[in-house]
Each structure stands twice: as C-alpha cells, then as structure tokens.
Amino acid sequence: MVTPISDMLRLWTIDSGEEKKESGTDRDLIPLATPLMASGYTPSGMEFLTDKMKDFNMVPYSAASAGIDEVPRPLEAGGAVSATLVTGDLKLGAVGTVTYVDKDHMVAFGHPFLDKGSSSYFMHNSYIFTVVPSRNIPFKLGSVGAEIGTVNEDRGSGISGLSGKVPESVRLHSSVLDEDTGRTQSLNVRMVQNERMLPMLSVTSVYNNMSNTLDRNGEGTVSLSYTLFPEDLKKRPFTRSNMYWSSKDISERSVDEMYNVIRILEQNRFEPYKLRDISVDMKVTKDRKTAQLLDASASPTVVSPGDTIYVRARLAPYRGEVFYKDLAFTVPKDQPLGTMILEVRGGGVVPLPYLIQQQKYNLTDEILERIRTYKDFNDLFDKLEKEDKNNQVVVEILDPNVSMISRDEENGTKAEIQDKRPSQNPDYLKGKKGDGKEGEKEEDSPKSSVDTDYVVYGDGQFTFQVMAPEDRDRALRKLAKSNQKMIADMKNEGKDSISGKDKDGKKEETKEENGKKPDTDKKSGTSYFLMSDSMTRL
C-alpha cells in the first residue's frame, strides 16, 4: 500500500482547520500489531512490558542503542524518525521512515502509529539497523535516539511532527531500596500525556526499576509510598502508602495498586485529573513480613450510641513473637438500638461474609467497580486515598444480614452463616445512608484502624448490645455484681484448688488438662471472637 504525499501533507493543515477529513485510507482493515523499540529494560521488565502491551495491540522489541543516538540531528527525507511514548532512562517508541521535511515540519511513516488523531508524542531521531521480514508485516528494527520535537498528528495517512517543540508529558521518578543488599536505584522518565496509556506506561517503568534494583525474581515484602501531582495546581495531590507481600513476584505485586489508582483518577467520569509528576518510593526485602490476626477482645459489651469500645487484637508474625495492638472504636451516635456486630480484620482482607455474598451474586471485581457510586470527584478521591492499608488492623461495623455470627449468641465465640433474602445489590456495597442513587453520597461505615509493621491477614466478628443509656447502666451494674460474685467464688475455691480436690475430696480435671481451652466468661463484660477464614483483597 502506497500513501500519496498529498494525503500526508494534509496533516500540516489540520491544526489550522483548513482540512478536517482524510481520504485514501481504509478504516475497515484489521489493524496489525504495532512493533515498538524498547531500550533500558531488563529481561523481566521486557516480559512484563510485552504482557501489558497486548491490550494496546503493540509488540515491544528489545533494541540496542547506537553510538550516535544521543546527538540531535536534523531530519531529512529518507532518514529515520521515532514516535516515542517513553523517554529518559527508558525509551519506548515506533521507528519509521521520514517522507518529507519542510524546515521544522515533517511527515513520516505513510501509515498510522496509534491512529489517535491530534496527539502529543515525543519525536526522536532514530537509527535503523535492519528490516525484519515477516509474513504478517515486515518492520524496521532500530534504536530510539535523541529527542528533537513533537509528533502532533497521528492519522491514517501517517504522522506529522514539529522539530524544537516540547510535548506535554508526565514525569515519573522511582526510587527502590533493596534492604537485603543495601542497593538503591533511581529511575527518571517522561511519558506521553495519554489517560488510557499512562497507567500502563507508569507501572511498567516502575516495575523495571524494581527488577533492575533487585536483580532477581520471586518472593518479598515491599513498603511503598507514592504521590500523584496534578497538572492543575488548584487540585490536590494524591498521596498514599501501603505494604504488600508476594510469594511469587513481588515486583509485579508492588505496582498493582498504583495501576488501578492512576487508571481510576485519569479516567474518572467527573472531571479531568491530568498528571504532571509521579513520585514512587519503595523498600523491598526478601523476608516475609506478614502477621496472622489470632483473636481479639473488646470491652464493654453493652454500650450506648456515642460510647467508646476498646479493642485489643492479638497477632502472630510469621516465625515471630506474638504482639498486641489496641484500638478505640466510637459507636455512632445514630446507631440503632439492638445488636451491633463489629468486624476486626487486616486492612487488605475481604471479610468472609462479604466474600460469600460476592460469590453468591457471582460478582466480579469489574462488576463491583461499576456498582459503586460516588457523589462527585472529591468523593471518589477521598475514598481512594483513605482506602484501608494491608498493614493495618481495622475495626468496623459489619452488616448483620451478612454476618457469620448467630443472632442468638451473646458474644462472638461461634461463627455461623446467616440466611439472607436476595436483594438487588449486596449489602456490603450499600452505604449506611442513601440508596445508591446517582448524585447521592453514601456515608462510609464508621471504622477505626491502627498501623503495624506487617501485612495483616485474618478477620473475625463479635456482637455488642446497643441500649439506651439508662438500660446500659442497669445492665453494666448487673454485670458488675456478677463479677463480684465470681471473684468471691474463686476465693472460696482457692484452698481446694491448691490441693487439686473438689469439695467431695475428688481431684478436679480442668479443661486445659483435657486439651481444651476454657470457655469465655460471658459475665466479665469482655467479648471475644474466633477467627474466620478470609480472603486477602487483591
């Protein structure tokens, strides 16, 4: 297929409005995968990049650099040029032949690159090593050289560019510390300002820096923090930190969250959130820094709206010593009287009752994301930034309709799946108030959290009775009397306990001697629960 030069030269007139319609191109043809030249990527970085590029119908090839790559050269017809997506410590772009040059303007390729119309890619010199034959489509294998301008049009007849003009871009700085070796690596790149491609370009760059620093694959724990700076200085930067453990590929696991956050913010339906800078800092170790939530206790068990519940969680690190974390949870002032169920969990854990309901309705993560509603951009922004962290212990109210605790139980020592009548949406997608209608903000469920130095797994629930203040005081006085009687009984039995005999002279056999744990004392005013199996949120 030969593209007439007249069609290509029309690309220069599109900005002025003199020519809006192209001819001589066939939009019904099936697009072939676009080959890209990549330099600066590690072998595992190339594998990751190749996998992510499939969604964009692109195939990256590792390309060596030529000795003259970093020296800017004027373009000339018949020479090579690159339309580039990433530049800096990494380079990623498509190379092709320059068709015509007029001063600082040029047209090239004779076919589309991404076919995005008016665009803003980096324009680079290029050096072509050879032409790779292929039954599908032969392509030029070359290097991406020095930056010289902007590719401003990308249409069916080819690309056009302007030398000396700097395109819009997003800067990314990534710093990775390998705590095992003490090695630190930094990476600086600029990426095209394209809201659909930016999430992929960002995480493949960060992944490559992680791969380059660790120089290994496999398990590890990463502590990361990142900030997204918007182009509009009136908008708030997005800052978040988190912690991840992976037994397979910590490099890939470490960039999952950032990919989703950038995608959601850049592609949100409310208002533009164009980025100008991304800063990422990571600390990685091969050690497994995880902790299992064993159990928890809370007091008091009888409360009124506005009261404070004190929770102590017991956790066991992987091959480490058990430790405790204390939290205070305030009962909402508008909490209905009756049974209230609290969930204690790791910050990245999906409670088992919710997971069961998700499976019951056959809801995928994509469906869940579509069901969730937000009032406006600020609501979306705040929810993303305040999302629970994997290294937190979280206490929150659990919907009683999906709890695994029997309503007949006075404390949380037993787990039982509740029957539930089907509804249109699972209850865990509904806020405390509001019906999820468009434009109506759903209130977040009250919660409390505390940070740890570990990725926390496990969850469980226990119940509390919410009463009016006068009823609460009466119930607490009754509990206090029961406690006093219990203490007196223990003192009276103390002498017999020393001899190991009961009142009839027979030796007592405790539940611990039988290999059983003593039952929780329901009169103590402290509630305990057993842990349920759960699933870590991906």
Positions of the model-derived regions?
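Terminal presequence/propeptide segments associated with secretion/organelle targeting
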Residues: 1-538
